[in-house]
């Protein structure tokens, strides 16, 4: 698949095939990709925790807030939950990471996972103190993102919209997840 196809296929995934496992090495390989990416002032202030243990996965799962636009849904059911997690932290000993670094790292993990047939959900809304307790993380590390990873179970489609249209993603009656995306022409400030 070429790069454009990779990017277009890299959709947020919230339901995973629970029969397929994610290994510690799978997660380590994704974090390894991040170390090659740019970092503002070359601070490299991001740190990562990788979790592929079912018991710890279950604890992490309970700290996450899934799909804010989908009402009455608390996240994937048993058998559709992620097989692993990458947790992203800022190390305060190195100063705050540039916000761009966080986005670059998350997108690199997402694209790396997608290139291997996996999918992720980049989550910023979670119980950060509970994550630190579960993982036994020190005071110098502040949680920034939780990235569940697994093999996708859901179908996600992109719906073209224009500026001003409703941007809320939704699931239709067939459980197909629709993600509205503004058309390229409307993104341009000077045409």
Show the residue positions of the predicted features:
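Acidic, surface-exposed loops and disordered segments
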Residues: 1-191
């Amino acid at each position: 698949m070429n790069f454009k196809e990779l990017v277009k296929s890299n959709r947020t995934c919230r339901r995973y095939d629970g029969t397929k496992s994610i290994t510690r090495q799978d997660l380590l390989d994704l974090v390894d990709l991040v170390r090659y990416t740019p970092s503002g002032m070359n601070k490299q202030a991001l740190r990562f925790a990788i979790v592929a243990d079912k018991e710890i996965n279950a604890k992490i799962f309970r700290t996450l807030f899934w799909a804010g636009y989908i009402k009455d849904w608390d996240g994937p059911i048993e058998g559709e939950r992620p097989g692993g997690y990458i947790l992203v932290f800022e190390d305060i000993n190195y100063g705050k990471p540039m916000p761009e670094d966080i986005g670059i790292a998350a997108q690199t993990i997402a694209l790396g996972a997608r290139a291997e047939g996996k999918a992720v959900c980049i989550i910023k809304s979670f119980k950060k103190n509970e994550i630190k307790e579960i993982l036994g993380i020190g005071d110098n590390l502040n949680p920034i993102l939780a990235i569940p990873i697994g093999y996708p179970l859901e179908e996600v489609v992109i719906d073209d919209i224009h500026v001003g249209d409703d941007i809320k993603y939704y699931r239709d009656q067939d459980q197909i997840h629709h993600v509205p995306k503004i058309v390229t022409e409307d993104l341009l400030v000077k045409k």
